[in-house]
Amino acid sequence: AIDDNRFDQMFKLAEMWQAEEVKLNISNAEMRPRILPNQDIKVMVKWPTDATRMIESFMVATNACVGNMLGKAGAPLPWRCHAPPDTAEVLELNAKLAALGVDIELPMPSFKTHGQSDSDELSDLLGAWANTTIAPIPTVKPPINEANDVAPYLANVLDPKARQDILDSLMDAQSKASSLANKTRRVVDQGLFHLMQRANYSHKNLGHFGLNLDAYAHFTSPIRRYPDLMAHRQLKSMIRGEDWVYDEAETADIAEHCSNQSVIAKYIEWELVANAYHIHLLRGGEVDSTSQNTYPPIMEKSWPARIVSLRTPWVYLDLNDDGAIQGRMHLRQMDSKQRLNIDENGLEVTSAEPGRDGEHRVVARLGEKYPCRLRGIDIWGGSLDLAPR
């Protein structure tokens, strides 16, 4: 399609939309193992291309357009919702960055909704903290008129300005991280990635933080996702002036069911992809290559890995330091003779007992290179089992 001039206008329009977008730039490689008929395994790593970005732009625009159209009409929908970062996780990342001496501090997320005053937001927060309902703080409010009304389907959506402020702060952190040394930059990138919540379906529209949209409903894939089929049926009802096919109660039940099933399906996909790739590695295969259906002894091989996360009792490593392949190493693999600890900020692996000098020996630090080798695969966890080189 890139070389076909029939698509020139579509590419230009998509590029214009992309230039105007205000959203996080988080692109991860997609691992694509293929099990061939003779049981050989072919593995490729796919990154976004101009063509896939163009298609994604049109799909997102279509989903948002249909969501707003049906939302204004009052149609019950299984909205695709994505929440902003969790306050506790922002605090944890800030503490980690401060301990690393990185001059990046993320502000606490705001949870102000469309049309909500600052005092009402404060009341909601205080009520949530106290696990009770607190009467709104009295304020002088302007008279409500048609211009100030908030459409019912947007009542629970994060205020666009509040959402914009959070996104701006995260993008600013990304920009600052790009000028840091590799060791620190990867830590910041990984931390920002893990701030992102998992999207889900809900009968209440909560907006889509990652896409920076007030309303988002899956519509473009009715042959493989039931929520898309629901949106198609509701749209037909609107066009024909008929009653909604799905009412609010049924939509709520289906949205919850689809969310649960999508999580299960995603975990199964991750495990299958991971295990196929790990078997490929055990056969001595590489990325963008085919491994034979034989099992010769693995030759001693190591990767120039980088430590990207420390969470007791695991050390997570990026094998090629490019974000494509990750595995994990148990603390016991780093030193079988003594017990090791990870500090509260997830910055260092140290000896649990002090040495003769009274100091705790530092075994490894977050962001450091740590060459490793493959021990095997954790079939149930779907992860590479690593050991020091």
Predicted features by range, described:
Residues 349, 353-369:
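C-terminal structured domains
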